[in-house]
């Protein structure tokens, strides 16, 4: 586009336009790397109102300084490099976050959604601790950064809200516009009464979008409670995540989580206790291990009966047949009992193994989620530590630079003073030679005392300066034997005494 802002930022392309202004991708041409930045150009929404530009300027600078502080101390909020105004337009120059928005990657899995939600809640905890409400959370305003895959929260609504400032007849200032995106705004937000749970409401709907790739208006809702029917659009929904989201998107603020911290704790406490219970197992009666043995040992042998000899063969045949049948039945019953016992035991064993496997998988997933959370928090802590170290290093380097600059300035002042004295001495000497003086004042450049008599006991009658002309009139010694000259001082026109070591012939 080859358009520049402040003769510094070269516009690369437009990133979007809205009711409050325009957003551009630009290059910072005044640094060697020509780093990419995002420039937001904002315009007052009520150009013809009674609200003064000075008031909007003041509100803009206040909110911009808050945004600068947030980005400086949290790596998941873009840094604010600069802010300024020009021709009744207001500019923010921010860090360019390279990555993809949640709008672009949807739909995602429940596990991915939980990780993103946990990380964003950590960021919101920090933002809310500063008394700030984002006001415009939606999929487009959350970027998964390429460098570390952490979700970055962009486009805070507070600065844009200042563009709608108007002054009431009572003298108080309010915003005449509502910041937010239709479908993601909580009911209280449309009336200008945003609270911390307003952000949680929008975050819940944003996570629903990442799971379904559907806007809130595309879901049917319960006519009595207003609850959205979104879970039927997710093929495999995590029950823990669903429970947390449903509470966050309650219509009444009092029914939602009171804070990002509360929602974060709910998400992780449910995950910690969220191992699926084993499915109810069918009760199967299994014979005790010794039942088959009891059945065999309790089988009665044929009873001995005395019969007439003539019928002995028939009796034997009948009894023997019955005994064989009884034995066969006993064996069959035993086999059936053992088989039933083995089958039932196999079913129970399988169900126990399956339950144990499910519990182990749930525990593994919980540990992985916790590990991801810890790693994300460690990265945040490392980034914050690195930022603090860089800031300390910058402050120390700046202190050393200022000290070195002060020392150079001091040396320069001393050099100039010495140079001035040297020039003055040369000038005095030239003047003395021109006047026909027989001698000049010598010694280190500066003033010298001319006294009323030969010695330091006498008072000072005037002062001469190195290089000024003298005429020698007489000489004498003081009480210590030091030689003094009585001189006529051309500079003052006075006659007095000066120590011999201060006279050059």
Swiss-Prot record:
Residues the record marks as active site: 136 (proton acceptor)
Keyword Iron: no
EC primary class: transferase
Domain Protein kinase: 9-271
Keyword Transferase in annotation: yes
Membrane-spanning parts: none
EC number: 2.7.11.1
Binding site for ATP: 15-23, 40
Keywords tagged on the record: ATP-binding, Kinase, Nucleotide-binding, Serine/threonine-protein kinase, Transferase
GO molecular function, one term: ATP binding
Pfam family, one: SH3_3
Domain SH3b residue range list: 436-505
Coiled-coil intervals: none
Gene3D superfamilies assigned to the protein according to its UniProt record, in alphabetical order: SH3 Domains, Transferase(Phosphotransferase) domain 1
Reactions this protein catalyses: L-seryl-[protein] + ATP = O-phospho-L-seryl-[protein] + ADP + H(+); L-threonyl-[protein] + ATP = O-phospho-L-threonyl-[protein] + ADP + H(+)
Family per record: Belongs to the protein kinase superfamily. Ser/Thr protein kinase family.
Protein name in UniProt: Serine/threonine-protein kinase D
Gene name, Swiss-Prot/TrEMBL: spkD
């Amino acid at each position: 586009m080859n358009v520049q802002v402040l003769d510094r930022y070269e516009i690369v392309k437009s990133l979007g336009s809205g009711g409050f202004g325009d957003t551009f991708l630009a290059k910072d041409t005044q640094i060697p790397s020509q780093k990419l930045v995002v420039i937001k150009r904002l315009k007052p929404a009520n150009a013809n109102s009674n609200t003064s530009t000075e008031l909007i300027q003041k509100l803009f600078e206040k909110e911009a300084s808050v945004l600068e502080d947030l980005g400086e101390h949290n790596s998941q909020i873009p840094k604010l490099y600069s802010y300024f105004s020009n021709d009744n337009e207001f500019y923010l120059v921010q860090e360019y976050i390279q990555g993809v928005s949640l709008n672009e990657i949807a739909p995602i899995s429940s596990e991915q959604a939980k990780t993103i939600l946990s990380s964003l809640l950590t960021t919101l905890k920090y933002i809310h601790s500063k008394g700030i409400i984002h006001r415009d959370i939606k999929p487009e305003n959350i970027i998964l950064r390429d460098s570390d895959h952490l979700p970055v929260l962009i486009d805070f609504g507070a600065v844009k809200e200042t563009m709608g400032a108007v002054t009431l007849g009572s003298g108080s200032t309010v915003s005449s516009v509502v910041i937010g995106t239709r479908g993601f705004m909580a009911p209280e937000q449309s009336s200008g009464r945003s609270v911390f749970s307003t952000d949680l409401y929008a975050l819940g709907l944003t996570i629903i979008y990442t799971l379904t790739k559907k806007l809130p208006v595309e879901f049917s809702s319960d006519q009595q409670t207003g609850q959205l029917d979104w879970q039927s659009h997710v093929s495999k929904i995590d029950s823990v995540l669903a429970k947390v989201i449903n509470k966050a998107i309650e219509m009444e603020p009092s029914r939602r989580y009171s804070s990002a911290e509360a929602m974060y704790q709910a998400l992780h406490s449910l995950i910690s206790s969220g191992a699926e219970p084993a499915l109810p197992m069918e009760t199967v009666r299994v014979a005790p291990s010794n039942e088959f043995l009891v059945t065999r040992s309790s089988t009665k042998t044929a009873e001995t009966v005395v019969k007439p000899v003539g019928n002995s063969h028939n009796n034997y045949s009948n009894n023997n047949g019955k005994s064989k049948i009884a034995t066969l039945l006993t064996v069959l019953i035993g086999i059936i009992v053992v088989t039933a016992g083995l089958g039932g035991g196999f079913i129970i064993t399988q169900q126990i193994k399956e339950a144990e496997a499910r519990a182990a998988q749930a525990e593994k997933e919980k540990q992985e989620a916790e590990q991801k959370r810890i790693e994300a928090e460690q990265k945040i802590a490392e980034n914050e530590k690195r930022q603090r170290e860089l800031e300390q290093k910058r402050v120390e380097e700046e202190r050393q630079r200022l000290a070195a600059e002060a020392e150079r300035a001091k040396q320069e002042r001393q050099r100039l003073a010495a140079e001035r004295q040297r020039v003055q001495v040369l000038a005095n000497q030239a003047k003395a030679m021109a006047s026909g003086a027989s001698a000049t004042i010598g010694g280190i450049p500066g003033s010298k005392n001319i006294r009323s008599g030969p010695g330091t006991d006498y008072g000072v009658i005037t002062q001469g300066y190195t290089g000024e002309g003298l005429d020698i009139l007489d000489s004498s010694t003081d009480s210590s034997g030091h030689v003094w000259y009585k001189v006529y001082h051309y500079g003052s026109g006075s006659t007095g005494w000066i120590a011999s070591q201060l006279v050059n012939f």
